[in-house]
Amino acid sequence: MFRGVATVSLDSKNRLVVPARYRDALLVNGAGRVVVTADPGQCLLLYPLPEWEPIEKKLTALSDFNPRTRSLKQLLVGYAHDIDMDSAGRVLLPPMLRKFAELDKNVVLVGQGSKVELWNEARWEAQVAQALSFSQEALPSELEGFTL
C-alpha cells in the first residue's frame, strides 16, 4: 500500500531514488520489478509488476473500435516500461517518459494505494491548488456522505 507525498531529486543519470517507505513495498510486492507508464493527467504511474499485470490484461481486452478506449489503451499500454529497481533502490526513467511528464530535477511522488504517481513539481503544486479550490457543491456523487 502506497500513501504519502515525497519530493525526491533525479540523479545525474536520471535515476529516481525511491524513498525507503515505497522501496520496501516494491520489494515485497514485486521483487523490485516495476512498470512505469504515462497517465492522462501528464504524470507517470509506477506499479509493482504484479499490480500492473491485471490492469494491462483488462486494457488489452478493450475494443479498438471505440476511439476513446483505443486512445487510453495506446497511452497506458504504449508507454508502459518494465524496469528493475537496482540494489540502491533506484529506477532509471526512460527519456520518453521523462519528456511526457516534463520531469526535471525534482520529482514529487504521490502514493495512491496500489501505485505511485510521479509528478513534475510545478504541475503537482497546480494540481493541489486545483483540488483545494473545489467547493462542496462540486464534489462527485460518489463522495456524498463520505467523511474523514
From Swiss-Prot:
**Cell compartments where the protein resides:** Cytoplasm, Nucleoid
Give GO terms: molecular function aspect only: DNA-binding transcription factor activity; transcription cis-regulatory region binding
Q: Name one GO biological process term.
A: negative regulation of DNA-templated transcription initiation
Where are its TM segments located? none
**Chief location of this protein within or outside the cell:** cytoplasm
- Sorted alphabetically, which Pfam families does this protein's record hold? MraZ
* Chain ranges of the SpoVT-AbrB domain: 5-51, 80-123
Q: Which GO terms describe its cellular component?
A: cytoplasm; nucleoid
Assigned keywords, A-Z:
Cytoplasm, DNA-binding, Repeat, Transcription, Transcription regulation
Q: Which InterPro entries match?
A: MraZ, MraZ_C, MraZ_dom, MraZ_N, MraZ_sf, SpoVT-AbrB_dom, SpoVT-AbrB_sf
PROSITE patterns, sorted: SPOVT_ABRB (PS51740)
Checking SUPFAM superfamilies in the record gives: AbrB/MazE/MraZ-like
Q: How does it assemble?
A: Forms oligomers.
| PANTHER family listed in its UniProt record | TRANSCRIPTIONAL REGULATOR MRAZ
Q: Which family does it belong to?
A: Belongs to the MraZ family.
Family annotation (HAMAP family): MraZ (MF_01008)
Q: What is this protein called?
A: Transcriptional regulator MraZ
What is the species listed in this Swiss-Prot or TrEMBL entry?
Thiobacillus denitrificans (strain ATCC 25259 / T1)
